[in-house]
Amino acid sequence: MGTSLWLQPPRNSPIWQQLATTIQGLKPIFSDSENFEPHITLTSNISVNTQGQVDFVLDRAVAAAKCVPQGFQIHLSSVKYGSRFFKKVYLQVEPTPELLSLARICREDFVYMPEAMSQARNYQAMSAEERQKIDTQVGQRAAEWTRNEYDPHVSLVYSDLYPVEDADRRTIETRLEDTFGSGYDESGLGWKNGRFALVRCEGPVDEWEVLGVRDF
């Protein structure tokens, strides 16, 4: 997974506190569960080696998010269950055009374009036509990834335990209703704007390293 770019609720906002409390509160149900901060992963597999590269990623993400005139809005919906460690229990996020556009830009600028430039013999020395061809291919690749692979969500549990038993599901859903209110999945739960965090996700979850953040 390497380094990932997270979109988080505004720090210490009510939704931040509710999600963080939920993540902590569900840990006893899963013996191998880890604690982590609430977030939506925009993209993974980012390669950064210097503080300058960290700053570039965060500043570029903020610039892209600020292109939304009315502010960047996140909408959460119903709880889902999966088989994968990082998608065991999660809240689905509405894939709005603004969110998908942001994820595509991040994938293109921070993952696919650096890969393409490193594979090119000398990108900067190429003709404008050659660079445009690479740029187009990278853009198409990012658009395809966004369309076919990107699935925005807010994880509540990391675990290898599978399946999630019916009794545990009932407990989880009761706790979610206690925290967010009955019918939370249809009540407009979410947040506006927030924080970008660049996180090195290597090794055990408790060893993940936050490389930098930007509030917007």
UniProtKB/Swiss-Prot annotation:
Q: Which residues belong to the signal peptide in this entry?
A: none
Q: Where is the active site?
A: H39, H153
Q: What EC number(s) has UniProt assigned to this enzyme?
A: 3.1.4.37
Keywords per UniProt: Golgi apparatus, Hydrolase
- Gene Ontology cellular-component terms listed: Golgi apparatus
| Molecular-function annotations in GO | 2',3'-cyclic-nucleotide 3'-phosphodiesterase activity
SUPFAM superfamilies linked to this entry: LigT-like
Return the InterPro entries for the record.
Cyclic-nucl_3Pdiesterase, Cyclic_Pdiesterase
What is one Gene Ontology biological process annotated in the Swiss-Prot or TrEMBL record? cyclic nucleotide metabolic process
* UniProt-annotated binding residues for substrate: T41, S155, Y158
Location in the cell reads: Golgi apparatus
Q: Which reaction does it catalyse?
A: a nucleoside 2',3'-cyclic phosphate + H2O = a nucleoside 2'-phosphate + H(+)
Q: Which family does it belong to?
A: Belongs to the 2H phosphoesterase superfamily. CPD1 family.
Q: What does this protein do?
A: Involved in the metabolism of ADP-ribose 1',2'-cyclic phosphate which is produced as a consequence of tRNA splicing.
**UniProt-recorded name of the protein:** 2',3'-cyclic-nucleotide 3'-phosphodiesterase
Organism encoding this protein: Yarrowia lipolytica (strain CLIB 122 / E 150)
Traced from the root, the source organism's taxonomic lineage reads: Eukaryota, Fungi, Dikarya, Ascomycota, Saccharomycotina
